[in-house]
Amino acid sequence: MTVLLVALGGALGATTRYLTGRYVDSYRSFPVATFLVNVAGCLILGLLSGASLSEQTFALLGTGFCGGLTTYSTFAVESVGLLRIRRALPSVVYVVASVAAGLAAAWLGFRLTS
């Protein structure tokens, strides 16, 4: 049962990430969508981690949804992609802002529910 909950949550999270990317990044040359979904995922996972949830609920929302929503691999490829087209400063800003905002969002989420 837990595996099915993770799969369902993952499908919903990945679909949310895909739709966010289709809508947001169609208007920008900077990886805004990946930044947004990763920070949102950190906030949600922080909220879930601080809350008293059943194992099944955490599997659905934490492991599944947040796991499908967030994407470290796309973050890495987009960072390198900016470097490849000689946009070093935007790449560095993207990396630093992503890590800082993700940590801050996770901390905030945890603080709000613990």
Swiss-Prot record:
UniProt name for this protein: Fluoride-specific ion channel FluC 2
Pfam families: CRCB
GO cellular component, one term: plasma membrane
A Gene Ontology molecular function term of the record: metal ion binding
Biological role: Fluoride-specific ion channel. Important for reducing fluoride concentration in the cell, thus reducing its toxicity.
Keywords associated with the record: Cell membrane, Ion channel, Ion transport, Membrane, Metal-binding, Sodium, Transmembrane, Transmembrane helix, Transport
Family listed: Belongs to the fluoride channel Fluc/FEX (TC 1.A.43) family.
Organism: Rhodococcus jostii (strain RHA1)
InterPro entries from the UniProt entry: FluC
Regulation: Na(+) is not transported, but it plays an essential structural role and its presence is essential for fluoride channel function.
Places the protein is found: Cell membrane
TM helices/strands, residue ranges: 30-50, 57-77, 88-108
Principal location listed in the UniProt entry: membrane
